[in-house]
């Protein structure tokens, strides 16, 4: 079997969210194969199902006035940040009732990507995502509707980590964030990171990647 890979480039969050829903409907209907959307977002704060707003360090209006979009969404988890230099992946895959297994597979794929750079990263029991020590390298939060996933992961490649300081990331006080750039001491080409993520997903899910159609607004 195969999965479709669509590289969308830099896409505003609201536009990408709407496109996810469209792709989700097509996968549910059986009109397209499992699909992995890869993209970056302009600066945006998103709040998931567990969020109450207490982990926002400023009023919602402050974020919008200071160059951040802000969205309340249906993914799992609390509050997180997306921005340029961060590789966001939305795997829109049939998962049925195997949601925990699906989350573990995403984690394993990211662990393999990190290992390819010589980084020992791992899941931490009780916390979503992939970690290096006390710092989160990759956030994970999904939603499942009609047996098909959407939302996904956010891997810090060359992310400006200072932008995380305006929230309590994932609601985890005392935990930090990191990036491939910080860990390696150099910029990582985004196209290289994308290729490694696609290869890791192919290995973990046992699917063959096929380049998808060009995204149109």
Swiss-Prot record:
<comment type="function">
    <text>Catalyzes the transfer of endogenously produced octanoic acid from octanoyl-acyl-carrier-protein onto the lipoyl domains of lipoate-dependent enzymes. Lipoyl-ACP can also act as a substrate although octanoyl-ACP is likely to be the physiological substrate.</text>
</comment>
<dbReference type="GO" id="GO:0033819">
    <property type="term" value="F:lipoyl(octanoyl) transferase activity"/>
</dbReference>
<comment type="similarity">
    <text>Belongs to the LipB family.</text>
</comment>
<feature type="binding site">
    <location>
        <begin position="75"/>
        <end position="82"/>
    </location>
    <ligand>
        <name>substrate</name>
    </ligand>
</feature>
<feature type="site" description="Lowers pKa of active site Cys">
    <location>
        <position position="136"/>
    </location>
</feature>
<dbReference type="GO" id="GO:0036211">
    <property type="term" value="P:protein modification process"/>
</dbReference>
<feature type="binding site">
    <location>
        <begin position="139"/>
        <end position="141"/>
    </location>
    <ligand>
        <name>substrate</name>
    </ligand>
</feature>
<dbReference type="InterPro" id="IPR045864">
    <property type="entry name" value="aa-tRNA-synth_II/BPL/LPL"/>
</dbReference>
<dbReference type="InterPro" id="IPR000544">
    <property type="entry name" value="Octanoyltransferase"/>
</dbReference>
<comment type="pathway">
    <text>Protein modification; protein lipoylation via endogenous pathway; protein N(6)-(lipoyl)lysine from octanoyl-[acyl-carrier-protein]: step 1/2.</text>
</comment>
<feature type="active site" description="Acyl-thioester intermediate">
    <location>
        <position position="170"/>
    </location>
</feature>
<feature type="binding site">
    <location>
        <begin position="152"/>
        <end position="154"/>
    </location>
    <ligand>
        <name>substrate</name>
    </ligand>
</feature>
<protein>
    <recommendedName>
        <fullName>Octanoyltransferase</fullName>
        <ecNumber>2.3.1.181</ecNumber>
    </recommendedName>
</protein>
<keyword id="KW-0808">Transferase</keyword>
<dbReference type="InterPro" id="IPR004143">
    <property type="entry name" value="BPL_LPL_catalytic"/>
</dbReference>
<keyword id="KW-0012">Acyltransferase</keyword>
<dbReference type="InterPro" id="IPR020605">
    <property type="entry name" value="Octanoyltransferase_CS"/>
</dbReference>
<dbReference type="Pfam" id="PF21948">
    <property type="entry name" value="LplA-B_cat"/>
</dbReference>
<dbReference type="GO" id="GO:0005737">
    <property type="term" value="C:cytoplasm"/>
</dbReference>
<keyword id="KW-0963">Cytoplasm</keyword>
<feature type="domain" description="BPL/LPL catalytic">
    <location>
        <begin position="30"/>
        <end position="209"/>
    </location>
</feature>
């Amino acid at each position: 079997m195969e999965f479709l890979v669509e590289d969308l480039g830099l896409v505003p969050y609201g536009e990408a969210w709407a496109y996810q829903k469209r792709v989700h409907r097509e996968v549910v209907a059986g009109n397209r194969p499992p699909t992995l959307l890869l993209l970056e977002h302009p600066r945006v704060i998103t709040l998931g199902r567990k969020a109450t707003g207490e982990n926002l360090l400023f009023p919602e209006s402050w974020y919008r006035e200071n160059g951040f979009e802000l969205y309340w969404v249906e993914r799992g988890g609390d509050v997180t940040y997306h921005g340029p230099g961060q590789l966001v992946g939305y795997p829109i895959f049939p998962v049925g009732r195997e949601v925990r297994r699906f989350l573990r597979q995403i984690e394993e794929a990211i662990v393999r990507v990190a290992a390819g750079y010589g980084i020992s990263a791992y899941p931490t029991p009780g916390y979503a995502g992939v970690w290096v020590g006390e710092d989160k390298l990759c956030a994970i939060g999904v939603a499942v509707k009609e047996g098909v996933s959407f939302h996904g992961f956010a891997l810090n490649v060359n992310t400006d980590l200072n932008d995380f300081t305006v929230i309590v990331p994932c609601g985890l006080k005392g935990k930090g964030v990191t990036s491939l750039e910080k860990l390696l001491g150099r910029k990582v080409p985004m196209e290289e990171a994308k290729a490694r993520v696609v290869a890791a997903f192919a290995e973990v899910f046992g699917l063959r990647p096929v380049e998808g159609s060009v995204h149109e607004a």
